[in-house]
Every structure is written in C-alpha cells, then in structure tokens.
C-alpha cells in the first residue's frame, strides 16, 4: 500500500512539473537604473522627470528646485504616453495632429501629447519610459530624455 501511494505521488509530482506553462522571461527596469536615468537627465537639463517600469508604475520622480510643480505630473504623463504608444511623445503628437481620427486622444486624461516622453528599450524589449517636463519646451525636454537614455545604455526604439 505504501509503495503504491509513493508511486502515485511521484507520478503526480512529475506530471505537475511537466504541465507548468512555459512563460516568457522579460527584462525589467530596476530602481538602480531609474536612478542612473534621473542623474543623467539632470546632467543634461533642469526639468522634472519620471521613470516608469513596463507596467506604468513610477520607479523614480524628481522635480528640481525652481521647476514648476505642474511639471512633475506632466513628466509622468509624458512617460505614460511614450510607454503606452511605444513611441516618443513628440513624434506621436505630430502624427496625431496630422490624423483627424486621432483628435480625441487629447481627451484621455493619462496621455499628454507633448514632446519629452520616450519609451525605453533594452535589447529590443520595452522595459519602461522616461518623461521630462519643464526644461524649456517640448524640444528641449525630448533632447534631454534622449541624451539621458543613451547615456545609461538604453534606446528609444526597438
């Protein structure tokens, strides 16, 4: 009886191990890299910044003294827009302006169609996003985000 019980237990465990799904593994943006991005951003400009992970969660948010308080939320929304669309926000805003069907995108509260948000890719995989606001305008915000991204070894395209 004990041998039979042990045999069925072994078969059940082996079967359970084989039935486990083969889930994909993904690179994750960690807090250390988010800090590096923040430091790199502030080397290139003085603006508020937000770093999001692949799920849209804030890993790092910072607003230097003298930068308007509204810019922190703007940086987060720019990062969220870049993450959601997998596109730099200035390019996305330009495309939206040229497409009448995209006019309603401005009504989605979480999106901000202004330059300064960039998706973050590691070896072709989306790992998060960086948003910059208050550095002197959309072009400056975007340039700052792109420079910081390159400095830490990430890219803004697949």
Explain the meaning of each model-derived region.
Residues 3-15:
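Bacterial N-terminal signal peptides
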Residues 19-158:
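Flexible, solvent-exposed loop/hinge segments and secondary-structure transition points
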């Amino acid at each position: 009886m004990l041998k039979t019980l042990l045999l069925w237990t072994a078969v059940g465990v082996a079967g359970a191990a084989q039935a486990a799904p083969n889930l994909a593994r993904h690179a994750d943006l960690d807090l250390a890299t988010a800090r590096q991005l923040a430091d790199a951003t502030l080397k290139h400009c003085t603006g508020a910044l937000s770093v999001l992970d692949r799920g849209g969660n804030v890993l790092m948010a910072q607003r230097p003294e003298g930068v308007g308080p509204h810019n922190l939320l703007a940086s987060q929304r720019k990062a969220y827009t870049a993450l959601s669309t997998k596109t730099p926000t200035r390019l996305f805003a330009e495309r939206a302006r040229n497409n009448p069907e995209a006019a309603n995108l401005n009504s989605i509260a979480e999106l901000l169609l202004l330059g300064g948000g960039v998706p973050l890719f590691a070896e072709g995989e989306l790992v998060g996003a960086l948003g910059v606001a208050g550095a002197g305008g959309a072009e400056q915000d975007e340039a700052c985000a792109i420079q910081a991204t390159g400095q830490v070894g990430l890219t803004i395209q697949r």
